[in-house]
Amino acid sequence: MAIDLPGMGRDKTPIQDVKMKSTVEKICQLIDGIEGKVILVGHSKNGIMISQAAEYRPQKIEKLIYLAAYLIPNGKTQREYSARDEGGWLKPYVTQHPETNSHTLHPDIYKQGLYHDCDEDITEMAKCILSNEPVESGFTPLHLTNKNFNSVPRYYIECMEDRAVTPFIQRVMYTETPCKKVYCMNTSHSPFFSKPKELTEIFCDIAELQ
């Protein structure tokens, strides 16, 4: 199940009103309505969202899967780690919008920065659906405890050709915050488009692990 987080996709929350707190609350509300435990997958920046959700609902989450995602320790922010990722391709193409506390990525970098191993129609689709990203969550420190967050097993899927969240920073993160298992894919930042079958097989493998 993939959901539209606040301000994203079909969710019409004004982007200036989107906060990390409301995003995590939406995830928690969703899993509260599902019988039994769930496995949460976070991609890219949304790694911070599933981490914070695990802190609030550890009893409802069976496993956490970080897909080329920000895996940030307690008290740190996503922005601190993205600043360390000097090899990423996206930063020169980011435009800040202070009036809405958001930023956008210039379409010129979509193909080479996000989808270089994907079909051309994926890039064209992205031009239609990618929009402003809220800034606030990137500067919000995570509040995680050993009792809650660290009680949920973590798995990492490293994208070896990622130009958005580079392999360098991915390895820094899963080294500093160890996971039960790390999988590697020879893909860009978007393996759900370039190698969906291989990604699905990894998801299934993680789901079956005890």
Regions found by a protein language model. Name each.
Residues V41-N46, I50:
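Gly/Ala-rich beta-loop-alpha elbow adjacent to hydrolase catalytic centers
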Residues T100-S151:
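Conserved alpha/beta-hydrolase catalytic His-Asp/Glu region
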Residues F193-E208:
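Post-His helix in hydrolase/transferase enzymes
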